[in-house]
Regions:
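Extreme N-terminal starter segment of soluble prokaryotic enzymes
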Residues: 1-5
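Active-site flanking residues adjacent to catalytic metal/cofactor-binding acidic residues
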Residues: 8, 50, 175
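Short, glycine/acidic-enriched loop or turn micro-motifs at the edges of active sites
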Residues: 12, 54, 153, 178-179
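Acidic/histidine-rich helix-loop elements
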Residues: 15-25
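Active-site alpha/beta core segments
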Residues: 30-145
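Histidine-anchored nucleotide/phosphate-binding helix
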Residues: 35-36, 157-166
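Short, flexible loop segments at boundaries between secondary-structure elements
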Residues: 172-186
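Short acidic-hydrophobic, aromatic-tinged amphipathic segments that line or gate anion-handling sites
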Residues: 199-204
Length: 204
């Protein structure tokens, strides 16, 4: 069975001291890096996703509700929107960016972009229309199973995993390689993923 690893949103913006920092984010980044170094040969395809917000509309708010609206985070072109240093050092080949001009949680809402440039709305839409999506990339690589890791389990990891399952992939989320915004939201996310047919496991 051909496998892919999706590393979701492991960026300083979601780690301690980031704009939407999650407790344990830096430690998860280091564990993911260790895992990739030990298991890289098992995967036919490895991809990262990033929040890469340019003008995401109401997704950013000065008075966020932390459900549909959020403080400014993942701002394209800033250091905090880049990959976490531990992940950047892995030199992963395929990078997908999402949320440029709207809210986006799932990695399957992203387009492949291996640069850090600021694209126009028209450029983003053109690349979406051209099929430069994560789903198409995985299918082109012959992938049938995906392992999902990253930040945050309760939000973008969950949505990426659920979308992968809906697209017909066998999906595993490694619980020791992700972290939720809160334990309560993590419990709810794990219940939702399990109900959606996603395997929850440890990476070792």
């Amino acid at each position: 069975m051909t496998k892919a690893l999706i590393v979701v949103d492991v960026q300083p913006t979601f780690c301690e001291s980031g704009e939407l920092g999650v407790a344990g984010g830096n430690a998860v980044a280091e564990r993911i890096a260790d895992y990739v170094n030990a298991h890289r040969s098992e995967y036919a395809y490895i991809a990262t996703t990033q929040d890469w917000h340019i003008e995401p509309g109401a997704h950013w708010s000065a008075e966020p509700d932390f459900v549909d609206t959020w403080p400014k985070h993942g701002a394209a072109g800033t250091l905090n929107a880049e990959l976490h240093p531990a992940i950047k050092a892995l030199n992963i080949e395929h990078h997908f960016k999402k949320g440029q001009y709207s809210a986006a949680y799932s990695g399957f809402e992203s387009i492949e972009d291996n640069t850090d440039r600021i694209q126009t709305r028209e450029e983003v839409e053109a690349e979406q229309s051209a099929g430069k999506t994560l789903a198409n990339a995985l299918k082109a690589a012959g992938v049938s199973r995906v392992d999902v890791v990253g930040i945050a389990e309760s939000h973008c990891v969950k949505d990426t995993a659920l979308d992968a399952k809906k697209l017909g992939f066998e999906v595993t989320v490694f619980e020791d390689l992700t972290v939720p915004v809160s334990e309560e939201l993590g419990v709810a996310a794990r219940k939702q993923m399990a109900a959606g047919g996603i395997t929850l496991a440890e990476s070792r």
